[in-house]
Amino acid sequence: MVFGELMSSAGDSGPGYVLNDFDAVPRLSYARSIDIRDSLSDLIRIQRDSYDAFIGIDEGSSGGIQSIFQSMFPIRDPLGRAVLEFVSCNIGEPQYDEYECIKRGITFSVPMRITLRFVVWKVQEVSFKEVKYVVDEGTLERSVKYMKEQEVSIGDLPMMTSYGTFIINGIERVIVSQMHRSPGVFFDSDKGKTYSSGKLIYSARIIPYRGSWLDFEFDIKDIIYFRIDKKRKLPVTYLLKALGMSNNDILDTFYDKVLYVRSDKGWKVPFVVDRFKGVRLSYDLMDVDGNVLIKANTRITLRIAKKLYADGLREYLVPFAGISGLFVATDLVDPASGAVIVSAGEAIAAEHIVKLELFDISEIAFLNIDFLTVGPYVLNTLFLDRHITQEDALFEIYRVLRSGESPNLEAVKSFFKGLFFEPDRYDLSVVGRIKLNSHLRLDIDENLTVLTKDDIVHVIKKLVLLRDGEGVVDDIDHLGNRRVRSVGEFIENQFRVGILRLERMIMDYMSSVNFDNAVPCDFVNPKILATVLKDFFSSSQLSQFMDQTNPLSEVTHKRRLSALGPGGLTRERAGFEVRDVHPTHYGRICPIETPEGQNIGLISSLAIYAKINKYGFIESPYRKVIDGVVTDSVEYLLATQESDYYIADAGAALDENNRFVDDMLYCRHGGNFVMVKREDVNYIDVSPKQIVSVAASLIPFLENNDANRALMGSNMQRQAVPLLKAEAPLVGTGMESVVAAGSGAVVLAKRDGVLHRVDRVLYPVIRAFDKNKDSILVLIYTTEKVQRSNHNTCINQRPIVKIGDYVRTNDVIADGAAIDRGELALGKNVLVAFMSWQGCNFEDSIVISSDVVKRDVFTSIHIEEFECVVRDTPLGPEKIMRSVPDVNEESLSHLDDVGIVNIGAEVSAGSVLVGKVTPRPPVSLPPETKLLVTIFGEKVFDCVDSSLYLPPDVEGTVIDVHVFVRRGVEENDRSLLIKQSEVNSFRKERDYEIDVVSEYFYDELKKLLCSADLPLNGHADVESLLAAKSLEALWEIGLSNPKISAKVADMKGKFDELITEAHSKFDQKIDKLNYGYDLPQGVLTIVKVFVAVKHNLQPGDKMAGRHGNKGVISRIVPVEDMPHLEDGTPVDIILNSLGVPSRMNIGQILETHLGWAAVNLGHRVGRMLDSGEEEGPVVERIRSFLSEVYEGQKLKEDVASMSDEALLKFANRLRRGVPMAAPVFEGPKDAQISRLLELADVDPSGQVDLYDGRSGQKFDRKVTVGYIYMLKLHHLVDDKIHARSVGPYGLVTQQPLGGKSHFGGQRFGEMECWALQAYGAAYTLQEMLTVKSDDTSPGRRPRVPYSESYYIKGDSNFECGIPESFNVMVKELRSLCLDVVLKHDKEFTSSNVE
């Protein structure tokens, strides 16, 4: 990869630089390193790439749907009479677009169809053993009796949207990627925790992608065992013998041989240096001549052994008795009789030495076991039961895995082969094979994804080497041993599950069907695959309801990595190690962003530049360094690769030639920091922020915050509610525009072009056209207007371009929720003072000025959806109607004639949104009721009110109504009106497109005809003649020039093609609209009402900054009482200064100072703009001042190149403040902030004199005042406050339900009782436990003091019943066979107790 487009917040530079109105003001950036931008262009690439690989879009992809079907087919009849073959797969187009699927509540999917070929062979005879086929005499191949090819539907496949989400039943969902242990082999130890002796117990585990796990482990006696799927362990030699190895094969495989040759003086043995390292001699070391070189009991070091070898020692003598205790490699046989003296693997004993001399054996091969560097572990395991055969081993393994069965030998062999050696039942995957080859240094084909005998042998060899002290165990938390499973892999696995079920069904059907009349569609049930996919998307732990609070929460959710889920960890069993930050996370997984609760460390986020390769391993980019010079080449490295290189920090100083300034640099190498020469450096980080995630990269001065507060800050940004008017932060990091563009919340231009029309009111689309080679291209961008998100926040896109603007590809042309001119805007810049104020900001409480509420600074719009379902009941259909029984007319005033609320109506708690009645069985009226009906003529309703009412805690404005009527059911007037409005919108869109095309061709045709030779017919010139004609008339003008005539004809053809296409799109939309709606069984109509609720800031709402500085609003103070500056400007927010030192998030103070400088710089620019020419030319003063502000920045050159008009326009945009960028780990230093404060004509300390708004007196000390970017979080007090008098009870315990969602009660628990006991409040306690408790029987309600009976009847007796919780306790005691009976003392009542 070549070094990509440099990140530059200054936009285009060069002479005549002009800032477009729709562009954000460039930021004064303090970045000291050059960034790459191509890696940041698509933040949700992790989702799209994975799904595209599954679909098979990527070229050269080995996966894909096609390969899944090819692996399944052909399917043959069990008797071989017929075969079902796969021909091709076709994925269709979605019936409805994404918006329509959300609106209708259906799944965004595409139909899948496969072409199958069913072939029936001609057979002569069929038996259980074989089938005799009829052979064609010409081709000598089997004759075909019948063949049918057919396209068959296999169900719908959910499609990923352009934003990386899935729409399931009208709800956007995200498939979270999963971190799991990579397939392959892993070596581990118990770290001495198993046995009290502290001895290390080593183990190995082969983990496949699919199939049985194979474990190897030592025990305390150094015997090697193996387990399959964690069942009962067996000696490892059982497995080796099941693989066909004999005792000699096992010994030859795991041990080297040493040949001892008899001589007159002893046994001659080859001298090998490595075998003597650290050995203490048990006998004198002699050369072959008998000369003593080293005395016995001497320890030989490696240096001594090498010196002996250098002195010419090639063989040494071992005394005849010195072979005692050595293990023979092969059977020692008496040459005369053939009797075995010593079996292979046995140790030489004293009696054996005598026999060896007696039988005159001249040479012996011993196993190289010295108990120091080579241990007898495999040998000892073999001798546990060395006489078992292969058949015995196979049966023993079978008995462990399938106890209670008695199969034959063939079944046992087939079972064992299927465990590890058949692709249908065992799959290492390509990743597992690569890891296995790398770990064991094997050279086996990557496509062989089953185990081999060599794999198992080499695993045991490496395990033995570990026990012998060679090598180290694996770190399971190393990212080289963990991989990411993304959405495409999950769906592929589910797809394979569904295909296997389909295959079994086809096999069953083949065994019973008559082949003569069968066609391919008879074999396939499309519901099988659809059911599997539906279950996964609906109920999987990793298929999650998308977090759509704001654009950042969407991006973060799509980039999330989870260690939980199927095949992963559980939060209860996950230890500290797997949750902790690992050195290999650098540049791959963010060390900051993770949940605070029990999922901490298990759920993380992908680092900002990281990407996932085709094998699922995370890679991080680095710039290549050659001979101390940083090049523009960027390479992505795996965690296993980067440990071999020296990697410098991105902040390392470079000269103008990109060469390191310092001779020695700190570099990362092998997980540690080392100091190396610059010539030895291999790579350098691409950016200082590459270690953090998207959310953490938005926190300015992150390096000045405590890690815990940085974690809270990154998490709370995702909870920020989009506000009524978005405002980008004055102090940002430069990542705001990147996140906004990559989130999908903005509308980006698809091509370069000129804005032709922007319709902001009637139809929310932006229309542009672009010349695509020789043809016109009309692009219509639909914007979302006041749509509801998953979390009830408001999504509203606003065009920021105007007619005539020239836009480039990927320019932002419409802002979304929480977006300001293409920059992420989650909160507001507000004036903050750090001080105490009457104790109202005690313990992180926040004091707010009433002016903030009045100006709607933190006001947000939330959209609530309410649904009314009209069903067909056994007594008749429910009906939507305005005349609802027992409801007064005032409550129905905002309904239309149909009975549905009008758009724009102001509704409050209890308002009727949809009037609906449900039939009820006829009831017999009492005589007095019949008399009243006869006298007064009242209508007797045979239905009950089942209308949709607004819940108690909602108040707002109805902004939209959707009516879905079942296809075939008569539509009401409201649904017809809604449909007509949609038709008008489609027609308007079509007409706009035709107008754009016609206008373009009209201009082009006039230009062409002006060059032609036309008769003037009394006109002064050709242009006046053409101007008087319409486009249709211009097409009909006769031309004598054949070349121009041909061009006109070509233009007419293109024009007709575009117009036809516009009409075709319109007709398709009308057809879909007229098709109707497929509603669930028994549902006639669904009415959805959307109510916009305005949430003003109020006490109890939660607010936070970007540094983890959170708090709850305690009081809204009148603006006149708030502290104010010397010029009378009141402070917006007061924060407690004591919340800073203990939390150690100093970043908020630095942001305060920098924000104070930014605003005051803007004020100074504003004063220059408002001043006259007395002090000199305004333009030149502004240019000089901005050049000083942007000193050392690229923006300084841009300011110098601006025209006077462009500069004034640019300066006017700076009135509210000069935007700053403090990138992560590259924030401005103290001296730089002080310089800006001095330029802004304010105190360099950042503190000012504040005056008490109530007394007007100045506070004793200066106060830190500045501008902070504050967020309003979605923890709103309106959603939390709740009260209940009487409500639902649990069926079993008869206790009130809990929580606001269940309209539950407030528990008065044990500790609350203790509190009342401590105060001695006996009557209050009795009242809480009885009168105000959970008695569920209205007939036994106690008479409460100060109730109706007290005031009207004068009854002041205080009578209490038994609370239901006491009855529950009694019943539980009775379930324990303890009979509890309450005795009532009539003399003891509360009325006679004095």
UniProtKB/Swiss-Prot annotation:
The lineage of its organism: Bacteria, Pseudomonadati, Pseudomonadota, Alphaproteobacteria, Rickettsiales. PROSITE patterns: RNA_POL_BETA. GO terms for cellular component: DNA-directed RNA polymerase complex. GO terms for molecular function: DNA binding; DNA-directed RNA polymerase activity; ribonucleoside binding. It comes from the Bacteria. HAMAP family: RNApol_bact_RpoB. NCBIfam families: PRK00405.1, rpoB. It catalyses: RNA(n) + a ribonucleoside 5'-triphosphate = RNA(n+1) + diphosphate. DNA-dependent RNA polymerase catalyzes the transcription of DNA into RNA using the four ribonucleoside triphosphates as substrates. Gene3D superfamilies: 2.40.50.100, 2.40.50.150, 3.90.1100.10, DNA-directed RNA polymerase, beta subunit, external 1 domain, DNA-directed RNA polymerase, subunit 2, domain 6, RNA polymerase alpha subunit dimerisation domain, RNA polymerase Rpb2, domain 2. Transmembrane segments: none annotated. Its EC number is 2.7.7.6. Pfam families: RNA_pol_Rpb2_1, RNA_pol_Rpb2_2, RNA_pol_Rpb2_3, RNA_pol_Rpb2_45, RNA_pol_Rpb2_6, RNA_pol_Rpb2_7. This is DNA-directed RNA polymerase subunit beta. The keyword Protein biosynthesis does not apply. Belongs to the RNA polymerase beta chain family.
